[in-house]
Amino acid sequence: MEEKFRPPTWIRFNSFYNASRSCPTRASLLTGLYPHQAGIGRMTFNDNLPGYRGQLTENGVTIAEVLKEAGYQTGMVGKWHIAETPLKSDQREWLAHHVYHEDFADKACYPVNRGFDDFYGIIYGVANYFDPLSLVNGDIPVRNVPKDYYITRALSDSAVSYVNRYANADKPFFLYLSYTAP
């Protein structure tokens, strides 16, 4: 498959080094920038400093945005965790599903608005494996899951589904799969 979709200026990255925690590493991996240049120098809380906004900067272009512009289909499955996720006043009630909020973060920061055609996964970094709080499909919250739901299996199934759909298309695809641990 690599030969079939090899662009004229193919680049293979052999190494990726980053000493940060999960969100800063994700931001760096997706943008090719140092975490603070991507806007997530610490975690997904806004520290009111340019490099520590808690979400990707507008000028930090994601690999999905670049590949989409080059004609690729782009999909993401799994843990996003690079959008500012402010604490709600009723956070504990929300986590226990006793109250419901429509958005988990600014939707402009969701994967489908940062270069990914498709997204199935969680916006927050925390996840209950059996009933994840911030589960979305595209940018629509998934409020109910089956009783036998297990997020790792669901993410794997979704990734396989995307690969099967993309592989039958006439253009190359990029799939970013990010499981929830850690």
Predicted ranges, named:
Residues 1-182:
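Formylglycine-dependent sulfatase
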